[in-house]
Amino acid sequence: MYGSSRHHLDSFSSNDGNAFLVQVGSRTFEAHELQKLIPQLEEAISRKDAQLRQQQSIVEGHIKRISELEGEVTTLQRECDKLRSVLEQKAQSAASPGQPPSPSPRTDQLGNDLQQKAVFPADGTQQRAKKIAVSAEPTNFENKPATLQHYNKTVAAKQMIRDAVQKNDFLKQLAKEQIIELVNCMYEMRARAGQWVIQEGEPGDRLFVVAEGELQVSREGATLGKMRAGTVMGELAILYNCTRTASVQALTDVQLWVLDRSVFQMITQRLGMERHSQIINFLSKVSIFANLTEDRISKIADVMDQDYYDGGHYILRQGEKGDAFFVINSGQVKVTQQIEGEKEAREIRILNQGDFFGERALLGDEVRTANIIAQAPGVEVLTLDRESFTKLIGDLDTLRKDYGDKERVATLVREPPSPVKIVDDFREEFANVTLKNVKRLATLGVGGFGRVELVCVNGDKSKTYALKALKKKHIVDTRQQEHIFAERNIMMETSTDWIVKLYKTFRDQKFVYMLLEVCLGGELWTTLRDRGHFDDYTARFYVACVLEGLEYLHRKNIVYRDLKPENCLLANSGYLKLVDFGFAKKLASGRKTWTFCGTPEYVSPEIILNKGHDQAADYWALGIYICELMLGRPPFQASDPMKTYTLILKGVDALEIPNRRIGKTATALVKKLCRDNPGERLGSGSGGVNDIRKHRWFMGFDWEGLRTKTLKPPILPKVNNPADVTNFDNYPPDNDVPPDEFSGWDEGF
């Protein structure tokens, strides 16, 4: 049957041979009667069809209207996001660059962090606001006295401080030696009932541990909670410049133990530098490392694990196969060997601090030829396994072949090709340009230090530029002079399609200025905000552009330290360029830097813990960048920076990354980039950036097309003319005139 009916034809019959009777259910019809019914039935069917078409049209209209309303909601949401972004940046322009966004009313950075995991909100529920970078003042304690001032405390007081530190999710991550020094360097402070210990909005640079008494925490007059003995408060202030986000008042007479930021930084930096230098010194004595570059030895030092063995423990047993190398950090080990024909193992020698054993195991499977036994009370060793060693060094055959050859040339580090020499200096045409020649056309962005304006030179609007104006007084107040000069010097040194060009710098009594290449496609962050997230193809293109820029910087021993979509600009061509080099720094080969700076959601664990960092911090940020492009938000994000740092220290493996947008291959790349140990991150090995390019996520990607700009970009921004700023948010004029600044720090800018 081609249809269905509630009736069916039961039978056909003929009474006289001419008339046919048809029985339908309980009724009988003659054929001609049924024939008369056909037009009526067809008309009824036609009416039903018309009704169905009408209903379908109504439904389609409703669907269309729903779609229109969804579009209006999306448009309104984007406008709200834009307005929120503008308002937040406007607020930041009057605040310290180190001040993070205000936390939610129910949280603060004064107490201990709650146990939590990073939870990704449902689609479309998150509010996208620009992320704010933070920075401590640049520090260098290498030439400062080796001793720190210690303050007397009772045994009970020291234990109370240690217990408070161990309960704090951030501070408990510090090394044992650092915690001991931190406790010794804290000094006593007392406050009477009713006295304010911390006031909201004031700059903060001290951490407190409550020893006795009770305090009340409030924000904007509303009580948030109380703090009692054994509580840590203000830990964000020992990391970088920030303003207090809440007030703390003593309810009773209180006793506090206090640590200044400068002392905390000196403790972490000095001990970290001493440990790193000591390991490098140990490694330089090992014959198979003798001809490695200082940079490569430094990376080996980064990946060495620290282990402790009690006295009497066999670290190695004769006859076992080994794949690890050991350096004695403290204590002693006894070397014994079983000699054929002798019942007892013969003692060969005692090894002390700085001695090493097992180095041949790094070159291949080695049968241990002796026992290594920890001596009482115990021994601390630094360990390097063959897998980590191979990733850093590359071709082991080179080491095997040249082992012990003092004349050997170091060929283990991949030498990138030198950048192509630029024939024409693009800055020459700006040699005679002064501020008087520059005309402002529109505002492209605002921030804590100043504004970025679209400008033209000598009234020629056919060519436009970006003028970055930075308030000198604000720079001095936040002690960022060194960072600003570093930005100028690094950008003057660079010349590549992957980095915005700096043409010239100026200064007057109120500002220092940078005349920059303009990218009228706008910030990648704005495009990401409006689209919600990017697919695999789009994200891969923008990650590849960043990778080209990072490789260029790393070849010059420059660490970028502020990768995020906000600092990626779209050129008219749709290709990406890095901008904002305020945190970039040029490092000596094999050396680290120690200043806490970056964007909270993007900083690596070693920056948070002030262990010293290098270019590997950029590879961590690259992993976070991939996540944000594909998920629409960074993977580590919480209600305040301190909680964000706690999530980061828990590691990428603790993340619950939703796979609805980011596939297994991209997730695998993120986890290889975001390893806790900097030396284990993809890109830090002997293959450098090429190891990242070879990852499966980039399989089939046209790298040559990217470099020659023949690869079609996924998004082509609409730019109508050189003065078109429609791809940027609208900003109100700035009527706030900063005071003059005459200290002279900008001489030669």
Swiss-Prot record:
Cofactor entry: Mg(2+)
A Pfam family per the record: Pkinase
Domain AGC-kinase C-terminal: 699-749
E.C. number: 2.7.11.12
Intervals of motif Nuclear localization signal: 461-473
Residue ranges occupied by any Protein kinase domain in the UniProt entry: 438-698
Disulfide bonds: none
UniProt-annotated binding residues for ATP: L444, G445, V446, G447, G448, F449, G450, R451, V452, K468
Annotated 3',5'-cyclic GMP 1 binding sites: G234, E235, L236, A237, R244, T245
Subcellular localization(s) per the UniProt record: Cytoplasm; Nucleus
Gene Ontology MF terms: ATP binding; cGMP binding; cGMP-dependent protein kinase activity; metal ion binding; protein serine kinase activity
Active site: residue positions: D562 (proton acceptor)
Activity control: Binding of cGMP results in enzyme activation.
Keywords: ATP-binding, cGMP, cGMP-binding, Chemotaxis, Coiled coil, Cytoplasm, Developmental protein, Kinase, Magnesium, Metal-binding, Nucleotide-binding, Nucleus, Repeat, Serine/threonine-protein kinase, Transferase
UniProt keyword Zinc present: no
Residue segments, region Disordered: 87-111, 723-749
Coiled coil: 30-96
Residues noted as binding 3',5'-cyclic GMP 2 in the record, renumbered to the chain: R349, G358, E359, R360, A361, R368, T369, Y403
GO cellular component: cytoplasm; nucleus
Keyword Cell inner membrane included in the entry's annotation: no
Catalyzed chemical reaction(s): L-seryl-[protein] + ATP = O-phospho-L-seryl-[protein] + ADP + H(+); L-threonyl-[protein] + ATP = O-phospho-L-threonyl-[protein] + ADP + H(+)
Post-translational modification: Autophosphorylated.
Any one biological process term the GO annotation gives: receptor guanylyl cyclase signaling pathway
Role: Promotes chemoreceptor gene expression in response to increased cGMP levels by antagonizing the gene repression functions of the class II HDAC hda-4 and the mef-2 transcription factor. Regulates gene expression via recruitment of a histone deacetylase complex containing hda-2, saeg-1 and saeg-2. Represses body size and lifespan through the dbl-1 and insulin pathways, respectively. May also signal through daf-3 and/or daf-5. Role in egg-laying, dauer formation and motility. Regulates behavioral responses to various chemosensory stimuli in sensory neurons.
Family: Belongs to the protein kinase superfamily. AGC Ser/Thr protein kinase family. cGMP subfamily.
The name this protein goes by in its record: cGMP-dependent protein kinase egl-4
Gene name in the database record: egl-4
